[in-house]
Design a protein with these regions (language model features):
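Beta1/beta-strand and adjacent pyrophosphate-binding region of the FAD-binding site
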Residues: 1-10
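Glycine-rich FAD pyrophosphate-binding loop
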Residues: 9, 21-41
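N-terminal Rossmann-fold NAD(P) dinucleotide-binding loop
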Residues: 13-14
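N-terminal FAD cofactor-binding segment of flavoenzymes
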Residues: 33-75
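Short beta-strand to alpha-helix junction loop
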Residues: 85-106, 217-225
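Predominantly flavin-linked oxidoreductase catalytic cores and closely associated redox partners
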Residues: 106-239, 277
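FAD/FMN-dependent oxidoreductases across multiple families
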Residues: 220-294, 298, 303-304
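C-terminal helical "tail/cap" subdomain of flavin- and related membrane-associated enzymes
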Residues: 297-343
């Protein structure tokens, strides 16, 4: 039997696994994909994330995980009235495939057992343990643990099966392109005008590739909004696309007013986006790392008392939720579409 089975080797899961393994706990970190695996994400690590990585992983984000330009200098936001706001801070530009693998390798170095290409299909709780059904290739089997940490993110199934709740989603679509544009590649740009998206539209650069994307509530309208955004970028910023290299679609958790957080059910605890932590513009890495660490600390401090674990985790994670509320409140002042997010 494991002390803890962690599902999902993203920032939340790997941080929780490393934190608990360093405490001497027997930890299984199960990742359904082959690593390194692609993750649809801007890969812009803000200063807060860089500080957390140094604090919890003992070293700076390595250059091997980064793409060019390696330095991110902040965010430039355009509100729904066309006004531009510049928020400068130091950050890094990474490929999530490389960054997430590095985090999982750090968990493995702390003696967490990492099971790659292993999906968690279901879990069944008892008073003293959790039975998890896992599948690796054609082999389906079960493992037991005292606790489960669900860090699968928005596309995971364990939480939906446990709670019976179907989450609300935001659909994202982005393309990677060869071309040129009259914007500074060191910044992440976002636009909140309602004619360009139903959530936000964005631009950033990764290894010379121009990344352009939109997010919508109604997935059937994504092509319409994307075409409008491209036309806007051509007119306003001199976008010229020579060749589209890649496209992807993804889902985001739709954050509701009050930024509700679901910390877990019984012996199954939720971290990162699974719990509901997600900041504006899809920035979730900082809260994923911090929630994973705080969950691991709460679990270790009260290991024999599941109710105390859940309570301690909720208390420890409250500052993350408060930070999230403040961030969404700021965006609510920039776009009427987010008016219900005012504090």
């Amino acid at each position: 039997m494991y002390d803890v089975i962690v599902v999902g080797a993203g920032p939340a899961g790997s941080t929780a696994a490393k934190t608990l393994a360093e405490k001497g706990r027997k930890v299984l970190l199960a990742e359904r994909a082959k690593m390194p695996r692609y993750k649809s994400c801007s890969g812009q690590l803000i200063q807060k994330t860089l500080d957390l990585v140094e604090r919890y992983f003992g070293e700076p984000v390595p250059l091997s995980t980064m793409c060019t330009p390696t330095e991110n200098r902040g965010v430039i936001l355009t509100d729904d009235r066309g006004n531009t706001f510049r928020f400068e801070q130091s950050g890094r530009n990474v490929w999530r495939s490389s960054f997430d693998k590095w985090l999982a390798d750090k968990a493995a170095a702390a003696e967490a057992e990492v099971a790659k290409e292993t999906a968690a299909l279901a879990c069944e709780q008892r008073s003293d343990a959790v039975t998890v059904t896992l599948k690796s290739g054609e082999h389906t089997y079960t493992e037991q643990a005292r606790y489960v940490v669900d860090g699968e993110g928005v596309t995971g199934t364990l939480k939906r099966k446990l709670t019976g709740q179907e989450p609300e989603y935001i659909t994202t679509y982005q393309t990677y392109n060869q071309g040129s544009i009259a914007l500074d590649p060191h910044f992440f740009y976002a636009w909140l005008q309602p004619d360009l998206s139903q959530y936000d539209a964005w631009f950033n650069v990764k290894d010379g590739q121009l990344v352009l994307g939109v997010s919508v509530r109604d997935s059937e309208r994504i092509d319409e909004y994307f075409a409008r955004f491209i036309a806007y970028m051509q007119e306003k910023h001199g976008l010229r696309i020579e060749k589209q290299l890649k496209e992807d679609r993804w889902l985001l958790h739709r954050v509701r007013p009050g930024c509700p957080i679901d910390h877990g059910v019984g012996r199954v605890l939720f971290a990162g986006e699974t719990a509901g932590f997600l900041n504006p513009m899809g920035e979730g890495v900082s809260s994923a790392i911090e929630s994973g660490h705080r969950l691991g600390e709460a679990m270790e401090a009260h290991f024999d008392d599941p109710k105390a674990v859940l309570s301690a985790y909720a208390t420890a994670a409250r500052p993350l939720q408060d930070y999230m509320k403040r961030q969404w409140h700021l965006v609510s002042a920039m776009s009427d579409a987010f008016g219900d997010m005012k504090i």
